[in-house]
Regions:
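Nucleotidyltransferase catalytic core that binds NTPs
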Residues: 1-147
């Protein structure tokens, strides 16, 4: 069976993530990488939930065959260890800071073989509000200190 890889850098699983997982399942056995706390801080922000909690949330969707740690933003180690046939990601990484990560995936796919499948980004007002509240909460040092 083909190996399908996607990676999440999130505390909340929303409609867009579920769309990605459902699309990934069409192509084979789904591996979901969860960025470790260190990787999230380096890339995006301080996580609101622990790494273990974030892994459990993805497992509980029932849409992932394997949930694994992704220690780095770039996918080199993913390709060395999992050797995915497909990488599935939202198409929101074509521009902005994530463009570099996409380039890394494309380079690895050329090297190892495989295909990139980009799912149309899910724009949702509820998700925007959740993200804004999370960023606001994480801006408070007393909250971060409890972690």
């Amino acid at each position: 069976m083909a190996k399908v890889y996607t990676c999440f850098c999130t505390d909340v699983i929303h409609e867009g993530h579920l769309n990605i997982l459902r699309e990934a399942a069409k192509y084979g056995e789904v591996y979901v990488g969860i960025l470790t706390d260190r990787a999230m801080v380096c890339f995006n922000r301080f996580p609101a939930l622990s790494f273990e909690e974030r892994m459990e949330i993805v497992k509980n969707t029932g849409l992932a065959d394997h949930v694994v740690a992704q220690d780095e933003i770039l996918y080199d180690k993913v390709f060395e260890t999992i050797k995915p046939d497909y990488v599935v990601h939202g198409d929101n990484w074509k521009e902005g800071p994530e463009r570099m990560i996409r380039g890394n995936v494309v380079d690895n796919l050329k090297r190892y073989g495989g295909e990139l499948i980009e799912v149309p980004y899910t724009y949702n007002e509820t998700v925007k509000k959740i993200d804004a509240r999370m960023k606001e909460k994480l801006a408070m040092p007393e909250y971060r200190r409890r972690r």
